[in-house]
Amino acid sequence: MNAVRWEKARFWRILSPRFAGAPLSGEGAARHGGRWNRPGQPALYLPCDIETAFAEYQQEMGVRPGTFVAYEVSNATIVDLADAATRRSVGLKAADLTAPWKPIAWVDKLEPATWRAADRLLAASDGARVPSAAWPGGFNLVLWRWNQADGARVSFHDPLNDLAP
């Protein structure tokens, strides 16, 4: 596995109105789990570009209200799962990246391969760069740790304090 340090990068996210007052929370992802996190494991999913942010937010639900937010991530140790050799080193196949994780976990009661890979990555990284399953050619940064004593730092741009709870 090849983890690299990201010094500073910009990301985007659309927040549900329900979570707009907590833009740094990973509790929405922890509630039911996500493609790259088990239920109970907080995660922050940050699309790398605006188009991917919209596609990820809509997914199978279509257009719905949301708050568009710009994020800055710095000092993060990241594993790039867009790289085939890195994927193989954590036991993932290309098909695992877009496999239908919800039916695998919720209907079949099995562990998605992405959860097992994330378990292995947690010890050595703050997160991973992953291809978007919602937007072909798009990427997301998934963080499992942020704003702790050391490691990844995440902030968001809110000059007018619009996201205050």
Question: Residues of each region from the PLM?
Answer:
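Extended catalytic/binding region for NAD+/ADP-ribose chemistry, centered on the ART fold
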Residues: 34-61
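Active-site and NAD+-binding cores of ADP-ribose-processing enzymes
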Residues: 1-31, 35-38, 60-165
